């Protein structure tokens, strides 16, 4: 299993950065940022590992002798250690900007072993820092950056944000006279899908959503298939849509939009906006009434029901010759679009309104 890593800047993020010379070169300059210790303790408890990544201009030269750096730095480490907080690595670039080294943030030389070994849990790892270079560093790694600010996005807010994000999980149960549906969704995990609706082709289609959205789904539906497949498909869609909407929470940081065009001789188009407003448009024709034991007219009803509970705008269109390919391409393209839309890119609400409802 890959590691959930927080790559944390030191000066200005873990500890206060003095404005006189931007160096913590004596004990009297050492001051922890507010709430950093309780936040790191809480994040350690949900299996995050911590790595300090810091630029220290001219460290080891007359500009910044190591003797002045080491004493406050080691005291800082001892404070964290006394509270049960361990840093797995402390990575320091001692160079000046003009040295053009490959280890100074936002370059990624200091963490090259992590990138080479592919041991990062990319969706669940973050860079936390107070400078734009930290956010660029995150972008260069391919993970999310969180810009620390003592007022606007402090350690208390980072705690709340990462606790919400680390879960992004939902569990919905829907029991009616016609069906019993149990849906669990993990947006930050993939593989190990368990899907059983009693309709084999439908199971296959739902798995395509999970695979291409890179999420984990457990869906168990028991329905009145002795009558037909309508209630089973409809109630699964309603439950899945509600679970996806619940797992997204306040949608802070998500891409919000997604679109894609895949498969074989079929061309499927999916345009998705997790806007909080429901709108659905569907354009598809099939020559067969059924694919296996799955009614083709229920594809439209599935996505209409799903979008109503997701509170999203969804446009779907497909053309092609093979009904199996057309159906599969729609489910795959929706999964791809969903992957784009739910991917966390920053820590802001993706709307000028400041809310997505």
UniProtKB/Swiss-Prot annotation:
<feature type="binding site">
    <location>
        <position position="130"/>
    </location>
    <ligand>
        <name>Mg(2+)</name>
    </ligand>
</feature>
<dbReference type="InterPro" id="IPR020566">
    <property type="entry name" value="His_synth_bifunc_HisB"/>
</dbReference>
<comment type="pathway">
    <text>Amino-acid biosynthesis; L-histidine biosynthesis; L-histidine from 5-phospho-alpha-D-ribose 1-diphosphate: step 8/9.</text>
</comment>
<dbReference type="InterPro" id="IPR020565">
    <property type="entry name" value="ImidazoleglycerP_deHydtase_CS"/>
</dbReference>
<feature type="binding site">
    <location>
        <position position="93"/>
    </location>
    <ligand>
        <name>Zn(2+)</name>
    </ligand>
</feature>
<feature type="binding site">
    <location>
        <position position="101"/>
    </location>
    <ligand>
        <name>Zn(2+)</name>
    </ligand>
</feature>
<feature type="binding site">
    <location>
        <position position="95"/>
    </location>
    <ligand>
        <name>Zn(2+)</name>
    </ligand>
</feature>
<dbReference type="InterPro" id="IPR006543">
    <property type="entry name" value="Histidinol-phos"/>
</dbReference>
<dbReference type="Pfam" id="PF08645">
    <property type="entry name" value="PNK3P"/>
</dbReference>
<feature type="binding site">
    <location>
        <position position="103"/>
    </location>
    <ligand>
        <name>Zn(2+)</name>
    </ligand>
</feature>
<keyword id="KW-0511">Multifunctional enzyme</keyword>
<dbReference type="GO" id="GO:0000105">
    <property type="term" value="P:L-histidine biosynthetic process"/>
</dbReference>
<feature type="binding site">
    <location>
        <position position="11"/>
    </location>
    <ligand>
        <name>Mg(2+)</name>
    </ligand>
</feature>
<dbReference type="GO" id="GO:0004424">
    <property type="term" value="F:imidazoleglycerol-phosphate dehydratase activity"/>
</dbReference>
<keyword id="KW-0460">Magnesium</keyword>
<dbReference type="InterPro" id="IPR036412">
    <property type="entry name" value="HAD-like_sf"/>
</dbReference>
<feature type="binding site">
    <location>
        <position position="9"/>
    </location>
    <ligand>
        <name>Mg(2+)</name>
    </ligand>
</feature>
<dbReference type="Pfam" id="PF00475">
    <property type="entry name" value="IGPD"/>
</dbReference>
<comment type="pathway">
    <text>Amino-acid biosynthesis; L-histidine biosynthesis; L-histidine from 5-phospho-alpha-D-ribose 1-diphosphate: step 6/9.</text>
</comment>
<feature type="active site" description="Nucleophile">
    <location>
        <position position="9"/>
    </location>
</feature>
<dbReference type="InterPro" id="IPR023214">
    <property type="entry name" value="HAD_sf"/>
</dbReference>
<keyword id="KW-0456">Lyase</keyword>
<keyword id="KW-0368">Histidine biosynthesis</keyword>
<dbReference type="InterPro" id="IPR038494">
    <property type="entry name" value="IGPD_sf"/>
</dbReference>
<dbReference type="InterPro" id="IPR006549">
    <property type="entry name" value="HAD-SF_hydro_IIIA"/>
</dbReference>
<dbReference type="GO" id="GO:0046872">
    <property type="term" value="F:metal ion binding"/>
</dbReference>
<dbReference type="InterPro" id="IPR005954">
    <property type="entry name" value="HisB_N"/>
</dbReference>
<keyword id="KW-0862">Zinc</keyword>
<dbReference type="InterPro" id="IPR013954">
    <property type="entry name" value="PNK3P"/>
</dbReference>
<keyword id="KW-0378">Hydrolase</keyword>
<comment type="similarity">
    <text>In the C-terminal section; belongs to the imidazoleglycerol-phosphate dehydratase family.</text>
</comment>
<keyword id="KW-0479">Metal-binding</keyword>
<comment type="similarity">
    <text>In the N-terminal section; belongs to the histidinol-phosphatase family.</text>
</comment>
<feature type="active site" description="Proton donor">
    <location>
        <position position="11"/>
    </location>
</feature>
<dbReference type="InterPro" id="IPR020568">
    <property type="entry name" value="Ribosomal_Su5_D2-typ_SF"/>
</dbReference>
<feature type="region of interest" description="Imidazoleglycerol-phosphate dehydratase">
    <location>
        <begin position="168"/>
        <end position="357"/>
    </location>
</feature>
<keyword id="KW-0963">Cytoplasm</keyword>
<dbReference type="GO" id="GO:0004401">
    <property type="term" value="F:histidinol-phosphatase activity"/>
</dbReference>
<keyword id="KW-0028">Amino-acid biosynthesis</keyword>
<dbReference type="InterPro" id="IPR000807">
    <property type="entry name" value="ImidazoleglycerolP_deHydtase"/>
</dbReference>
<dbReference type="GO" id="GO:0005737">
    <property type="term" value="C:cytoplasm"/>
</dbReference>
<protein>
    <recommendedName>
        <fullName>Histidine biosynthesis bifunctional protein HisB</fullName>
        <ecNumber>3.1.3.15</ecNumber>
        <ecNumber>4.2.1.19</ecNumber>
    </recommendedName>
</protein>
């Amino acid at each position: 299993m890959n590691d959930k890593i927080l790559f944390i800047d030191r000066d200005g993020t873990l500890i206060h950065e003095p404005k006189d010379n931007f160096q913590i070169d004596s004990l009297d300059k050492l001051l922890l940022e507010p709430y950093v210790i309780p936040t790191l303790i809480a994040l350690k408890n949900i299996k995050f590992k911590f790595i300090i990544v810091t630029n220290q201009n001219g460290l080891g030269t007359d500009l910044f002798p190591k003797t002045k750096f080491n004493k406050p730095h080691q005291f800082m480490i001892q404070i964290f250690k006394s509270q049960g907080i361990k840093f797995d690595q402390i990575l320091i670039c001692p160079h000046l900007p003009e040295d053009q080294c490959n280890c100074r943030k936002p370059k990624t030389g200091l963490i090259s072993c992590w990138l080479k070994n592919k041991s990062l849990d990319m969706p669940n790892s973050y860079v936390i820092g107070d400078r734009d270079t930290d956010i660029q560093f995150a972008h260069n790694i391919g993970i999310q950056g969180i810009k620390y600010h003592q007022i606007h996005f402090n350690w208390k807010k980072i705690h709340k944000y990462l606790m919400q994000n680390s879960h992004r999980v939902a569990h919905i149960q829907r029991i009616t006279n016609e069906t019993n549906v149990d849906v669990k969704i993990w947006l930050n995990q993939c593989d190990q899908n368990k899907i059983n609706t009693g309709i084999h082709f439908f199971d296959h289609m739902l798995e395509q959503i999970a695979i291409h959205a890179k999420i984990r789904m457990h869906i168990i539906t028991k329905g009145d298939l002795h009558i037909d497949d309508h209630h089973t498909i409809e109630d699964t869609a309603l439950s899945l849509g509600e679970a996806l909407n619940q797992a997204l929470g306040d949608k802070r940081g998500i891409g919000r939009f997604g679109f894609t065009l895949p498969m074989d001789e079929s061309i499927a188009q999916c345009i998705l906006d997790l806007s909080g407003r429901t709108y659905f448009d569907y354009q598809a024709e099939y020559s067969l009434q059924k694919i296996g034991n799955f009614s083709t007219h229920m594809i439209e009803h599935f996505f209409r029901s799903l979008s109503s509970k997701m509170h999203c705008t969804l446009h779907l269109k497909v053309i092609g010759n093979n009904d199996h390919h057309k159906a599969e391409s729609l489910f795959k393209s929706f999964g791809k679009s969903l992957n784009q839309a739910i991917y966390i890119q920053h820590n802001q609400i993706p709307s000028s309104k400041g809310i997505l409802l």
